[in-house]
Design a protein with these regions (language model features):
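N-terminal "arm"/small-domain region of PLP-dependent enzymes with the aminotransferase-like
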Residues: 1-43
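N-terminal Rossmann-like NAD(P)+-binding domain of SDR-like oxidoreductases, especially those catalyzing
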Residues: 2, 105, 134, 154-155
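Phosphate-binding glycine-rich loop
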Residues: 46-90, 104, 114-116, 136-152
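Conserved coil-to-alpha-helix start sites within the AMP-binding
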Residues: 97-102
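Structured binding elements
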Residues: 109
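ATP-dependent adenylate-forming carboxylate-activation enzymes
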Residues: 117-132
Length: 155
């Protein structure tokens, strides 16, 4: 199993060399940007660079608005809240992910339910999700998905 996974990752990067978890890429202007940010005195959640990033994201995605977050975990947490995830809910996710995914679910007071991954894409398997839902869930009169065992909402 692991050999297949390692081969899949190496094929994506077209290399047999070491594949780092994170390899920073710098285009040469980082020192200038950091200096400009420090000189502006806006070094956290506001300032010219944050405003520019949000404008660029709106333009790129075509969305009405964009809000920069401190990190991916915070972004996932907000996204889950906006999706209606509440305390006691179950949230289907995949086990082959960064821990932030499960942490964000837990921050909402919900519980992650791990559904198998697709061997070809390494993303959540639609077939596995369908099988689990058909075996373990029902749609209530309000159109919500609930767990057969204890009626918890599945998001």
């Amino acid at each position: 199993m692991f050999d297949t996974l390692v081969r899949f990752i190496r094929d994506q990067y077209r290399t047999d060399d070491f594949v780092p978890l994170h390899a920073p890429v710098f285009n040469g202007h980082e020192r200038q940007y950091v200096a400009e940010t420090i000189e502006s005195t806006f070094v956290s959640s506001v300032g010219e660079f944050v405003d520019r990033f949000e404008r660029d994201m709106v333009r790129y995605t075509g969305s009405a608005r964009a809000v920069a977050m401190v990190n991916g975990t915070a972004a996932l947490h907000i996204a889950l809240q906006l999706a209606g995830v509440r305390r006691g809910d179950l949230v289907a996710t995949q086990p082959l992910t960064f821990v932030a995914t499960s942490n964000a679910i837990a921050y909402c007071g919900a519980e992650p339910v791990f559904v198998d991954v697709d061997r070809e894409t390494l993303g959540l398997s639609p077939k596995a999700l369908e099988a689990w839902l058909q075996e373990s869930a029902f749609i209530n009169n309000d159109g919500e998905c609930q767990l057969l065992a204890d009626d918890r909402i599945i998001r």
